[in-house]
Regions:
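Bacterial N-terminal signal peptides
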Residues: 8-19
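Predominantly soluble domains enriched in secretory-pathway, periplasmic, or organellar proteins
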Residues: 23, 124-468
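Aromatic- and Gly/Pro-enriched helix-to-coil junctions and flexible linker segments
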Residues: 20-139
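Positively charged n-region of N-terminal signal peptides that target proteins for export
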Residues: 1-4
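Short, solvent-exposed coil/turn linker segments
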Residues: 16, 33-34, 63, 78, ...
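Alpha-helical interaction segments
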Residues: 10, 106-109, 180, 357
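Intrinsic disorder/low-complexity segments
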Residues: 6-10, 26, 268
Length: 468
């Protein structure tokens, strides 16, 4: 089967996200502000509940380190973003009265609020002259598809460290950031914007450095052996082109679009040696394998009623490919050793709507969200059977999953349009108050949910450093 001719070079934006820079550049003069201006406010107004022997909700406001660590529920502040910092929202927007006034304590004055918000918007610079969570850290990225932002979660503190606001880069709230891919060293990350028809490239400091055009982009997958990336079409697109995109992530230039001869090609992945790409249809029980060297491709039928294969993933050893059927609750194991032929070797039943499986580095476990069951499933890849099903507070229409680099924590995004999860605090924002999206943090040593982060509207794609 023949490929399309190469496309024109992508447009690369000259914009940068300076408001989210994580380095301490030009921050030396601000290093003393916390001690002189910020800590005295917390000591006077907050210490009775958040210092010493009493730290309500686990929040210690006796030091910069304690503030940055956050509470049992997540971050207290987001550097460069006072408006979305819980501490500021509690003090200005809380339904029933500003905190701590509603608890019978003196509220912050306008001058004190201005001092705190200006400091946060300036980077929340600490005594060392740096913004919190600066440098090369292990981050998980979670898109807020309903509001045009991306959460940057630090895996050591398990808090939202930054929020990337795409509206500040010329996109609107309806750009629909969807899926994320991250380089193995964390140096760059990529996000698809469904409505904007773009794939964006950011540095780890969240500086926008590249862009490529692609109609209704959905899922991204990096070639483990080169700088290539493939991109499928969004699930939201009813009748997109029957092609997937192949581009270079160094240059951010589209190399070509590959014909896949199937409607709604959403799921995409690579063979581990980078020789083949695979795609599956949402509308039909069919997937395709494409040999990138020869251009030859083969279509493969999957038996049964329409499954709606949401995503494809290949194990680290390259021998098995998996996919979940949204409509049937089936989980498929394909034999990927041949690459051209991918026969089904086993099918099992799992909880409803298995989405976005990921693997640990050893390839012995697969983790996936069950969107219509409000659960997470762990599959033993050696036995190809369900090992554990996790449920609990915060799991509400789970969508994507990612692992911390040390594989201690599993992060699962939850869209919560079914209102299974209730907001901790009401801020007078009907969307947030009714449908707060979450990221559940699961400790894989115990398989227990240890933290529920409230992150924004319609959290979707969840990406961390790859496990290959």
């Amino acid at each position: 089967m023949k490929r399309l001719a190469p496309l024109a070079s992508s447009l690369v934006f000259g914009l940068t996200l300076t408001a989210c820079a994580q380095t301490g550049t030009n921050a030396g003069s601000a290093a003393g502000i916390y001690a002189s201006d910020i800590q005295p406010i917390f000591t006077a107004k907050c210490a009775s509940c958040h210092a010493g022997d009493r730290t309500d909700a686990g929040l210690d406001l006796s030091s910069w380190d304690g503030l940055v660590k956050g509470s049992d529920n997540g971050e207290a502040i987001i550097a460069y973003d006072a408006a979305n910092s819980v501490l500021v929202k509690m003090a200005t927007r809380l339904v029933g009265g500003a905190h701590p006034g509603e608890a019978g304590s003196p509220t912050l004055s306008e001058a004190e609020l201005t001092t705190i918000t200006d400091w946060i918007n300036g980077g929340a610079i600490g005594p060392d002259g740096n913004a919190p969570f600066s440098g090369n850290r292990d981050f998980i990225y979670v898109t807020n598809q309903g509001e045009g932002t991306v959460n940057v979660i630090d895996t050591e503190a398990n808090v939202v460290a930054r929020r990337v606001d795409l509206t500040k880069l010329g996109f609107d709230k309806g750009s629909k950031p969807h899926h994320v891919a991250v380089e193995s060293d964390g140096s760059y990350w990529y996000v698809t914007l469904i409505s904007a028809g773009r794939v964006l490239k950011f540095t780890q400091d969240s500086e926008l450095v590249g862009s490529v055009e692609f109609e209704v982009p959905g899922l991204l997958e990096m070639d483990p052996t080169s700088s290539r990336m493939i991109v499928g079409r969004s699930m939201a697109a009813v009748n997109p082109p029957q092609r997937i995109g192949l581009f270079d992530r160094d240059s951010m230039e589209m190399e070509e679009e590959l014909e896949v001869f199937m409607p709604r090609p959403h799921a995409v992945t690579w063979s581990r040696d980078g020789s083949h790409v695979y795609a599956a249809s949402l509308a039909e029980n069919v997937l395709i394998s494409i040999d990138l060297e020869t251009g030859d491709s083969q279509l493969h039928d999957v038996e049964g009623p329409i499954h709606t294969l949401v995503e494809l993933q290949t194990t680290p050893d390259g021998k098995t490919m998996v996919s979940g059927g949204q409509l049937t609750g089936k989980f498929f194991f394909f034999d990927a050793t041949d690459k051209d032929g991918v026969p089904v070797k086993k099918v099992i039943d799992v909880e409803a709507a298995p989405w976005h499986p990921i693997f640990n580095k050893a390839g012995t476990r697969a983790y996936l969200a069950n969107k219509m069951a409000d659960k997470v499933t762990i599959i033993n890849m050696e036995t190809m059977e369900v090992e554990t099903v996790i449920e609990g507070n915060g799991l509400a229409q789970p969508h994507g999953a990612a692992l911390s680099s040390d594989e201690r924590y599993l992060y699962v995004s939850n869209q919560n349009q079914n209102m299974v999860y209730s907001a901790r605090h009401l801020y007078g924002d009907s969307q947030h108050d009714q449908h707060p999206g979450t990221v559940t943090v699961i400790d894989l040593e115990t398989n227990q949910i240890v933290k529920v982060l409230e992150v924004g509207l319609l959290p979707a794609g969840t990406g961390g450093r790859p496990t290959w």
